[in-house]
Amino acid sequence: MEQKRYALIVAGGHGLRMGADRPKQFLLLAGLPVLMHTLNRFAPHVDAIVLVLPTDHHAYWQELCRKYDFSVSHRVVAGGNTRFASVRNGLQVVPDGVLVAVHDGVRPLVSAETIDACFDLAELKGAVAPCRPMTESLRYYATDGNYAVDRSRYVTVQTPQTFRSEWLREAYRQPYEEYFTDDCSVYEHHFGRPVALIVGNIENIKLTTPLDLSLAKLLLTS
């Protein structure tokens, strides 16, 4: 029997690098706030959506939903001071025995194929992340200089990072460490085992700078 599928969308950033007058998840992209594009991408593929937002953004989000007549069903949960705390808060309303895909709210171009592939492999493996091969040259910085490294041995990791919900909740019970940069690092530190990887879609960029936003607009309208 197929497990139910949940999306846990984390949108706690303030977008300082974007240089805008509002958090980047609320910036307009092709006529809609970025975050609405993200929820729209997941809605056909999941049984429920949990949206984690800072408490001081809740009223503004409700206002945007009314303004844009946004009707995708979702539950809003209060975020924490860090991404780690925000995901942990979101997991409190996700039941055991389901698959949960944790996704950055400012990745609005994730494809249906990437979402489905993460869930499908998580049914078998229990822990999955999408990634992309490196295309730039890499160098390692050390105290005595810097050195070229073999880029074929490295990938960049995207979201949605998808897990059996009870596994991820258990991992998030451990104390926070500064090197927890994503859900995979939290999971691996707790269980001592790697996640499975799939190739994600190249358009699944995280909107961090004005250039990212311009590229996303081009991709959506081309």
Curated annotation (Swiss-Prot):
Catalytic activity: 2-C-methyl-D-erythritol 4-phosphate + CTP + H(+) = 4-CDP-2-C-methyl-D-erythritol + diphosphate
GO biological process per UniProt: isopentenyl diphosphate biosynthetic process, methylerythritol 4-phosphate pathway
Domain of life: Bacteria
Enzyme class: transferase
HAMAP family: IspD
Alphabetical keyword list: Isoprene biosynthesis, Nucleotidyltransferase, Transferase
A molecular-function term among this protein's GO annotations: 2-C-methyl-D-erythritol 4-phosphate cytidylyltransferase activity
Protein name (record): 2-C-methyl-D-erythritol 4-phosphate cytidylyltransferase
Family, per entry: Belongs to the IspD/TarI cytidylyltransferase family. IspD subfamily.
Site entry (Transition state stabilizer), positions: R17, K24
Site positions (Positions MEP for the nucleophilic attack): R151, K206
InterPro entries the record matches: IspD (IPR001228), IspD/TarI (IPR034683), IspD/TarI_cytidylyltransf_bact (IPR050088), Nucleotide-diphossugar_trans (IPR029044)
Role of this protein: Catalyzes the formation of 4-diphosphocytidyl-2-C-methyl-D-erythritol from CTP and 2-C-methyl-D-erythritol 4-phosphate (MEP).
PANTHER family: 2-C-METHYL-D-ERYTHRITOL 4-PHOSPHATE CYTIDYLYLTRANSFERASE, CHLOROPLASTIC
Keyword tRNA processing: no
Gene3D superfamilies: Spore Coat Polysaccharide Biosynthesis Protein SpsA, Chain A
Entry EC number(s): 2.7.7.60
UniProt pathway annotation: Isoprenoid biosynthesis; isopentenyl diphosphate biosynthesis via DXP pathway; isopentenyl diphosphate from 1-deoxy-D-xylulose 5-phosphate: step 2/6
Pfam families named in the record: IspD
